[in-house]
Every structure is written in C-alpha cells, then in structure tokens.
C-alpha cells in the first residue's frame, strides 16, 4: 500500500505541482472505495478496469488500463493504455502465431521496423464525435497523436480476426465454427485484454469475435473503453443479433445475444 500511496502522490505533484495536497494511505483507500457504483442509465459514470488482462500482465504479455465515461447510458469518452502493444501492426504474424506476446522473434521484428524509437507502448483516446487517436506511452517520445481508422477490408475470406486467449469464459470452438462458415481462412490472433479492440481500431485485425460460454456474464469494464475506440475509428460493435451493447444496465452487459462482434461497418454488415 505504501508504494501505491507514494505513486499517487508523485503523480499528483507531477500534474498539479506544489499545490497538490499529499494524501495519506487512508485518503487513497477511501478514494478507491468510492468506486462502488452499480452504474445504470442515469447520470455520469466512470467505467474503469485498472488492469484488464491480468494474466497477460503477469506473463509480461498484453494488458490494458481502460477507462470510459458514460453519460445517461451512452459512452462519451474512452482512454486505453496498452504498455506492451507494438506500435506497428505489421509485426503480427497471423499465419504462424497465436500470441500477441513478446517472443524473441517478435521483438526482433518490432525493433527492425521503422519505429523511430517507438516500438511498443500505445495510448488510445476517443471522444464521441471526434474520432480515435493513438500516441506513445513514453512521454519523452515526440509523436503527435495520430488518427486511427478501422480496416477497409470487405471480403470475409481475407479478414484477419482476433479473439480472447482464455478458454475459461470464451468458446473458441464456436468462434472457429463461425469463422469457417464465413469463409475466413486466417488463423485467429489471440490477445489478452481490450488490446483486441485497439487492434481492430487501428486495422491490425479486421474482426474481433467473442462468444461467452453459457452462464458467463460480460462485465461492462471489460468492453466499454474498447467499444467507443472502435466506433470512433469508424467501426461497429454489437451483439451477435446486431444490437448495440447495453452498458446502462448496471455492472453487466444486459440482454447480450450470444456474443460480441467488432468490425468495420462494411464488414460487420
């Protein structure tokens, strides 16, 4: 706890300066405990997943810090930090790799690219009606935010698709059957966390599909930030029946029809 309190105070001083009030451990704990809202359709709600993709984080693989603002049931802002996400999507090996992690070969490929010192660490931002943008996690790198857009691909047979790594709450077999029926020939790129949404938003992948196993309820913090990022990048996110995801029902996505699909608007149709 002491390390967390020290980091909080350091961050406050960095952004506020000498006027920042130093917080005690009890102050920090009290602030954390305020995050007990049950959500809902009324008012403004911050939707936070502080470490999305916990297993990816532990393994040194993909994870995200994901934050979204919902106002009267509608997503308005999304911010997602992806510390291990490669800057360049073309380093991904869809045909030979099932992982978005850091094998020695992948690291070599990332470093060999035209990354100008920025080879990993991406922050995505989106504001409703203003598009989605990406810039480096490392603030010392001098890069202006760049606008990201979803893939223009329309042919399902050539589509690159991504899905969750974990089988515990996602039916990879069902997803594979859907991909086969659509004629998708590419192997899936399996990624921890909402980095999957970032991959679709900047066109590393054309489609994200997740079909949860029976009885599993999708939590809003696992999707909110990623959904607005894809939508503001020109994509569409819905359940398998084509309905928008409902974030206004509380802590869970209510009324979900079978699964979640995120893609470019043209391909989604």
How does the language model describe each region?
Residues 43, 74-76, 121, 257-258:
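Conserved catalytic motifs of the protein kinase core domain
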Residues 46-66:
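Glycine/serine-rich anion-binding loops at beta->alpha junctions
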Residues 1-51, 74, 84-87, 138, ...:
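N-terminal subdomain of lithium-sensitive/metallo-dependent phosphomonoesterases centered on the IMPase/IPPase/PAP
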Residues 65-69, 78-79, 124:
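Short beta-strand scaffold segments in enzyme catalytic cores
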């Amino acid at each position: 706890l002491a390390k967390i309190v020290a980091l909080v105070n350091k961050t406050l001083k960095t952004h506020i300066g000498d006027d920042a009030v130093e917080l005690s451990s009890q102050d920090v704990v009290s602030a954390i405990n305020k995050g007990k809202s049950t959500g809902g359709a009324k008012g403004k709600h911050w939707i936070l997943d502080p470490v999305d993709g916990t297993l990816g984080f532990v393994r040194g693989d993909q994870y995200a810090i994901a934050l979204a603002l919902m106002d009267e049931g509608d997503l308005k802002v999304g911010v997602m930090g992806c510390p291990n996400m490669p800057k360049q999507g073309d380093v991904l090996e869809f045909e030979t790799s099932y992982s978005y992690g850091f094998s020695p070969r992948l690291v070599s490929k990332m470093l060999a690219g035209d990354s100008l010192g920025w080879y990993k660490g991406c922050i995505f931002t989106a504001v409703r009606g203003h598009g989605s943008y990406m810039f480096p996690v490392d603030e010392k790198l001098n890069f202006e935010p760049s606008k990201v857009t979803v893939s223009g691909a329309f042919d399902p047979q050539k589509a690159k698709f991504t899905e969750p790594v974990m089988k515990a709450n996602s039916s990879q077999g069902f997803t594979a059957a859907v991909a086969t029926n659509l004629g998708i020939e590419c192997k899936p790129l399996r990624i921890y966390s909402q980095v999957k949404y970032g991959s679709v938003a900047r066109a590393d992948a054309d489609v994200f599909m997740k079909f949860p196993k029976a009885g599993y309820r999708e939590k809003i913090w696992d999707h909110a930030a990623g959904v607005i990022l894809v939508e503001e990048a020109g994509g569409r996110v819905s359940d398998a029946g084509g309905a928008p995801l409902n974030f206004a029902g509380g802590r869970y996505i209510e009324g979900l029809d079978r699964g979640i699909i995120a893609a470019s608007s043209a391909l989604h149709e």
